Amino acid sequence: MKNYARISCTSRYVPENCVTNHQLSEMMDTSDEWIHSRTGISERRIVTQENTSDLCHQVAKQLLEKSGKQASEIDFILVATVTPDFNMPSVACQVQGAIGATEAFAFDISAACSGFVYALSMAEKLVLSGRYQTGLVIGGETFSKMLDWTDRSTAVLFGDGAAGVLIEAAETPHFLNEKLQADGQRWAALTSGYTINESPFYQGHKQASKTLQMEGRSIFDFAIKDVSQNILSLVTDETVDYLLLHQANVRIIDKIARKTKISREKFLTNMDKYGNTSAASIPILLDEAVENGTLILGSQQRVVLTGFGGGLTWGSLLLTL
């Protein structure tokens, strides 16, 4: 009986509009050298007309086309995002309607840059239950609508995009281990999208920023210490082939590699082309690695997927492909 789960297909979709560091230097007090030397980012994709659901719809459509699955075969759709089109309906429900997956239930997961890892973990448990065979897990963001485009400390970091996987029942284990974590006591280190209560009865605080606010140093230190410990709880240099970390900053990845004593060559990166796409960053990286042959589905390569971000949330999955 097929009671395990595996990733059987990957796909990504990013907006056509490419914004370079040089373009940003014309909008704010920054430069290509300043941005690239501190982050590893050279350019990012920014939407001009699309919203998060549009990006995720394209990913879902591509996953069906590439896998040969019919929409009616999809049992569930999970979308990881903190930049939905609306508070309701969920992006996942919009995607379900757009592709005609009438048999699927659908909901969003809000775990910031850890969202895809959280969602993929939940999807595996759904398949393990034996009740569901096939699902779509997508990470999608349009962070450009949450940024203060005059603040060089945050505006230069983020990009828009979406990517995801088809997860199916399997006869052998592919999800080998995991560790998901959170620390709500540090919630204020990274916030965005504060919703102001406009009720005439509400007497509480109404002055807060809707744009992204980040305690950069705190987040950097959190990633180096806590995320490194999380990874080491699952693997060592000898027991992993590749690591796909959330693409926040190349300096973070460099330091995590040193902290964990895992070969830097095993850490895949692509933030130079996309910037920080939050919940989309890991599946975008995964799909690119499959496309260029670095990762091969069905190869039994041992891979770690690690997310970390607002909440604070962080977590890793150890998989065989």
Curated annotation (Swiss-Prot):
Subcellular location(s) of the protein: Cytoplasm
Question: Which residues are the active-site ones?
Answer: C113, H246, N276
Does the UniProt entry include the keyword Hydrolase?
A: no
Which InterPro entries does the UniProt record give? ACP_syn_III_C, ACP_syn_III_N, FabH, Thiolase-like
UniProt cross-references to NCBIfam families, sorted A to Z: fabH (TIGR00747), PRK09352.1 (NF006829)
Relay the domain remarks: The last Arg residue of the ACP-binding site is essential for the weak association between ACP/AcpP and FabH.
In Swiss-Prot or TrEMBL terms, this protein is called: Beta-ketoacyl-[acyl-carrier-protein] synthase III
The protein's gene is named fabH
